[in-house]
């Protein structure tokens, strides 16, 4: 108990001082992306686009209000090439127990639709707009919809907040896709010449890269990263935090996990799944989306 109190105090002080929080010490292995959607178990499945991947897998908030619940939308990782909503199924069930409605968004990838990263972002923004337009019937508060994701899915979550110029051609642009907060798991936030995936998005990276589009009134953000991540560097996280502060005027809480690799937070790595979810709940409580 004394150790936990000490760790909590150190974490709070670090955040107040704008310092990275560093937690844990054991390595984890990367998430192995899966394209299988047949075993995603949700309370209901919605269609937001008329396509095989235009689906939203919804998990209802448990034991709280029957309407106007906060919602978190998760986007799976896989380099815009592969992946499945299944990746975040246990995170969805975890947050639902705290009165959060959770949505696992499917979207087009290279493997399932032969598309580019741009189409993935189009779908992500269409999903956010669909939820906002239909929030009342889904018992969601349209002013309390957050976005989350891992790796390329973290990029999509962040890009729904910052990247205004890429939209699905069928979107109602009068509906904002911008989430109220971001929960990012080793996210791809820099697609510039020194960032991830530049060769695939070079023709439109300035409209596609979250780092290059941060603006005032950015949503508060929590950012999880392993120090041994071979895709997202600690320096990238530092730059993102600094730009969120100086340009976005927003809170950005980075948590670094020593020795951890890309995908360390996934549910098969029980220790770090739990650690990141505990911090996620604390973040949501601090913003008033979860009550004690």
PLM features: residue spans?
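Short beta-strand element of the alpha/beta-hydrolase
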Residues: 68-78
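C-terminal catalytic histidine-bearing segment of alpha/beta-hydrolase fold enzymes
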Residues: 234, 238, 247-292
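Primarily recognizes the serine-hydrolase "nucleophile elbow" in alpha/beta-hydrolase
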Residues: 126-196, 205-206, 210
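Short beta-strand/loop motif that positions the catalytic acidic residue
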Residues: 223-225, 229
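Short amphipathic alpha-helix adjacent to the substrate-entry channel of hydrolases
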Residues: 86-104
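Alpha/beta-hydrolase active-site loop
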Residues: 115-136, 278
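Serine-hydrolase catalytic-loop signature spanning alpha/beta hydrolases and amidase-signature enzymes
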Residues: 79-83, 87, 102, 130
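N-terminal cap/lid segment of alpha/beta-hydrolase-fold proteins
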Residues: 29-65
